[in-house]
């Protein structure tokens, strides 16, 4: 007799009895869009299947890591081989050295790199390193940029320019974030005023160059150029959080795109995750040899981790980076992502629905402006001003038709090398149906 299949609703009800909110990361609960979360049973290529057996074209990609799609043969083989050799040793391995060398070869701004297990850990460590390197305490971050859930970074903007942040989570004492100043993304005037007031006290400026937790918002070239100039002028470090966009938007990550537009541009510290682990828990932060030499065991800035450089995770990451380093990989991925965004835009135009979208490499985002003719949002406030209700309706319209987008207006989407033109066309067809009155 066949085992009865649990429905998504049954599994969610069961999960809520043992897991807070029924999920292990809040966005998965569908609170932003309403409805019942899908419990995924398996995935392959560009597709996922839920507990009820329904198939979806996947544009979440585990929130970015699955740039090759699910179950890529080369990655799977590397992971299986590594697993037979041992899950974890608590000692150095050749493979972690090889992964570090591979990342450094692709990111010229970094001369050394330290592997950790999560993006939160990497961002937290990068801030500690910047403070240790400068002997200063204060930092700038930007509203709408997410850098993990370390206490000092869980901050929303204050009511005025020079107002330091208030915690956005219970359990974070106000004194922990008293050194964190939150500014408006892409606002040069506000940035200059902040440096004028606090320049000598600033350890660093931390930024997502393409903000994936505002959906998809780019830092403008003039804004990034001014950040670099002010950091250099005042002795603060520029920290690039590329956990999401690193090795997603270009082989050299987002910083390579700004280096093309701004002569001599480079961040001082870089944070990576997601793609470098290929779906396994792995992240990293890197900088010049001089800055990285401040880390223990060489220097006074302490950082450690039991599972850092895990041999199975590094095998997964290495195999992934080798595949995306193949000639033409990002050109093909970018063309497919552009095909999707252009198709969605055409579908919305035909339905008379205001729509704007953008993409880079295998990362994309879109918004439903409230007024026709509005351009792409430039900061968190303009993202907030877009039509949340329209997005929620669109999300469910696609979900019902077998297309799985991120269940929140504020999250980016991801295309993988496994997505075919047929998958893109099927998605656009579903969008046309969902946008009908």
From Swiss-Prot:
Give the location in the cell: Cytoplasm
Cofactors named for this entry: pyridoxal 5'-phosphate
Recorded GO MF terms: glutamate-1-semialdehyde 2,1-aminomutase activity; pyridoxal phosphate binding; transaminase activity
Cellular component terms (Gene Ontology) = cytoplasm
Query: SUPFAM superfamilies under this entry?
Result: PLP-dependent transferases (SSF53383)
Name the reaction it catalyses. (S)-4-amino-5-oxopentanoate = 5-aminolevulinate
For this protein, the record's InterPro entries field holds: 4pyrrol_synth_GluAld_NH2Trfase (IPR004639), Aminotrans_3 (IPR005814), PyrdxlP-dep_Trfase (IPR015424), PyrdxlP-dep_Trfase_major (IPR015421), PyrdxlP-dep_Trfase_small (IPR015422)
Keywords associated with the record = Cytoplasm, Isomerase, Porphyrin biosynthesis, Pyridoxal phosphate
EC number annotated for this UniProt entry: 5.4.3.8
N6-(pyridoxal phosphate)lysine: residues bearing it: 274
Major place of residence = cytoplasm
Q: Which GO terms describe its biological process?
A: protoporphyrinogen IX biosynthetic process
UniProt-listed Pfam families: Aminotran_3
Pathway info: Porphyrin-containing compound metabolism; protoporphyrin-IX biosynthesis; 5-aminolevulinate from L-glutamyl-tRNA(Glu): step 2/2
- Subunit field text: Homodimer.
Q: Which NCBIfam families match?
A: hemL (TIGR00713), PRK00062.1 (NF000818)
Q: Identify its protein family.
A: Belongs to the class-III pyridoxal-phosphate-dependent aminotransferase family. HemL subfamily.
Record HAMAP family: HemL_aminotrans_3
Q: What is this protein called?
A: Glutamate-1-semialdehyde 2,1-aminomutase
Provenance organism: Leptothrix cholodnii (strain ATCC 51168 / LMG 8142 / SP-6)
